[in-house]
């Protein structure tokens, strides 16, 4: 959430940032709403001060045996007590209205983010590796998985409906191996602390990371009012909500492998075959909590950590800097890692790494205190996929396909597969 004080002082900057995201200007309406809030609050405070002062004056008047003055003061206090509740309610209402308006404004992009309306304006930052070449025809992952008898979409549909998958045998083991490999890499070499967080969270957790109030259609809600997490970013980032952190101990780096749940409400007709876009999928998430000065360097580091997964798996990929119209709601800058899928003859997103400034820290009321500083500042947050298991599995299946239809196990995963080097058709 953006700071209303910053908006008052940078109205043109906000409207320019919103224009870059394809939205209209909002600074004037927000500032007007804030002026109303401040006027009402000042009036309320004046009434409260007068009530308190009049109450004290009653005692003084009675001590002086000035009953007429005491009676007038009592009448004034009684009237204030009658009108104060309405004024307090109006103050709460306008405060809630302003907070709601602020909570729906996306984060302001950094100056070096390319401006554009959609993914067509994203910029290739770097390309790593080369596209594989074979003599045999590339196939899509679902063709390979079904031919091996290890991927069952029809069975999943009978159980749960569309956009679910059943993995069996060595493909199920391969996805598990991918997750173990990623966690070992991030905890053993990259300095992240592994966490097993809740998969169900409350409204305020979703609000803190920016999923609420705008994106309810993308989420699954339980009958008791909790939410299934769309990403482990939500519980990992909210681990520091309503805390004051020691700035000397930052950054904090967390990682988790969790199921993620998304309704894909806006994806009708897209990627309907296979497991590219699922209601339920597994993902390794990376989250960093840091200070303002270190956030941009931490963004580059986090992206490099996610890239290392793809490098060790021997996968060709590119890094994209997302344009203003394609970035997520809470992000100030985002790098997407897009892995090459031969079966689709296309690059597809496998990781998204974002720096969010203090946008989420403000929503969560997460602060830090520096050693030499007075007071506190809102924490800066970052999140990234390290990486999505389902899409990593797809990439391995398509890039390591052999002419006979078997799949070679990448060297980095052989130990996690119990020494197995090739996945073949189920007996």
UniProtKB/Swiss-Prot annotation:
EC code: 6.1.1.11
Enzyme class, spelled out: ligase
Binding site for L-serine: 231-233, 285, 385
Keywords, comma-separated and alphabetical: Aminoacyl-tRNA synthetase, ATP-binding, Cytoplasm, Ligase, Nucleotide-binding, Protein biosynthesis
Catalytic activity: tRNA(Ser) + L-serine + ATP = L-seryl-tRNA(Ser) + AMP + diphosphate + H(+); tRNA(Sec) + L-serine + ATP = L-seryl-tRNA(Sec) + AMP + diphosphate + H(+)
InterPro entries per the UniProt record, alphabetical: aa-tRNA-synt_IIb, aa-tRNA-synth_II, aa-tRNA-synth_II/BPL/LPL, Ser-tRNA-ligase_type_1, Ser-tRNA-synth_1_N, SerRS_1_N_sf, SerRS_core, tRNA-bd_arm
GO term, biological process aspect, one: selenocysteine biosynthetic process
A GO CC term attached to the entry: cytoplasm
PROSITE patterns noted in UniProt: AA_TRNA_LIGASE_II (PS50862)
Pfam families in alphabetical order: Seryl_tRNA_N, tRNA-synt_2b
Gene Ontology molecular function: ATP binding; serine-tRNA ligase activity
Subcellular location: Cytoplasm
Pathway annotation: Aminoacyl-tRNA biosynthesis; selenocysteinyl-tRNA(Sec) biosynthesis; L-seryl-tRNA(Sec) from L-serine and tRNA(Sec): step 1/1
Positions annotated to bind ATP: 262-264, 349-352
Family note: Belongs to the class-II aminoacyl-tRNA synthetase family. Type-1 seryl-tRNA synthetase subfamily.
Domain notes: Consists of two distinct domains, a catalytic core and a N-terminal extension that is involved in tRNA binding.
Quaternary structure and partners: Homodimer. The tRNA molecule binds across the dimer.
HAMAP family xref list: Ser_tRNA_synth_type1 (MF_00176)
Physiological role: Catalyzes the attachment of serine to tRNA(Ser). Is also able to aminoacylate tRNA(Sec) with serine, to form the misacylated tRNA L-seryl-tRNA(Sec), which will be further converted into selenocysteinyl-tRNA(Sec).
Annotated protein name in UniProt: Serine--tRNA ligase
Underlying gene: serS
């Amino acid at each position: 959430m953006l700071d209303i004080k910053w908006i008052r002082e940078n109205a043109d900057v906000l409207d320019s940032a919103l224009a870059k995201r394809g939205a209209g200007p909002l600074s004037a309406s927000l500032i007007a709403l804030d002026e109303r809030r401040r006027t009402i609050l000042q009036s309320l405070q004046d009434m409260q001060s007068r009530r308190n002062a009049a109450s004290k004056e009653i005692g003084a008047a009675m001590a002086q045996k000035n009953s007429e003055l005491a009676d007038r003061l009592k009448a004034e206090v009684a009237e204030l007590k009658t009108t104060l509740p309405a004024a307090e309610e109006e103050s709460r209402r306008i405060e809630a209205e302003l907070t709601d308006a602020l909570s729906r404004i996306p984060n302001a992009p950094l100056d070096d983010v390319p401006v554009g309306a959609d993914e067509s304006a994203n910029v290739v930052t770097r390309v790593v590796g080369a596209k594989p070449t074979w003599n045999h025809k590339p196939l899509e992952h679902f063709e390979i998985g079904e031919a091996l008898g290890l991927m069952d979409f029809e069975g999943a549909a009978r159980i749960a409906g569309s956009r679910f998958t059943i993995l069996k045998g060595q493909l199920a083991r391969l996805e598990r191996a991918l997750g173990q490999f990623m966690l070992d890499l991030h905890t053993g070499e990259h300095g992240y602390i592994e966490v097993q967080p809740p998969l169900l969270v409350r409204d305020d957790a979703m609000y803190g990371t920016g999923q609420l109030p705008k994106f309810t259609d993308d989420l699954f809600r339980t009958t008791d009012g909790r939410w299934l997490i769309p990403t482990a970013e939500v519980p990992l980032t909210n681990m520091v909500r309503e805390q004051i952190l020691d700035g000397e101990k930052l950054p904090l780096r967390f990682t988790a492998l969790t199921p993620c749940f998304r309704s894909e409400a806006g994806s009708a007709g897209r990627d309907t075959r296979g497991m590219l876009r699922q209601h339920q999928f597994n993902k390794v998430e990376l989250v960093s909590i840091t200070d303002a000065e270190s956030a941009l360097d931490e963004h580059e580091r986090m992206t490099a950590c996610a890239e290392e997964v793809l490098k060790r798996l021997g996968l060709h990929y590119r890094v994209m800097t997302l344009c203003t119209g394609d970035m997520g709601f809470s992000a100030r800058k985002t790098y997407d890692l897009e892995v090459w899928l031969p079966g689709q003859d296309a690059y597809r997103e496998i990781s998204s790494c974002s720096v969010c400034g203090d946008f989420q820290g403000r929503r969560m009321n997460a602060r830090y205190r520096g050693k030499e500083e007075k007071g506190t500042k809102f924490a800066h947050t970052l999140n990234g996929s390290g990486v999505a298991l389902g899409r990593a599995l797809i990439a391995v299946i398509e890039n390591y396909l052999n002419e006979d239809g078997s799949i070679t196990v990448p060297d980095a995963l052989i130990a996690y597969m119990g020494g197995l080097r090739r996945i073949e058709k189920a007996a």
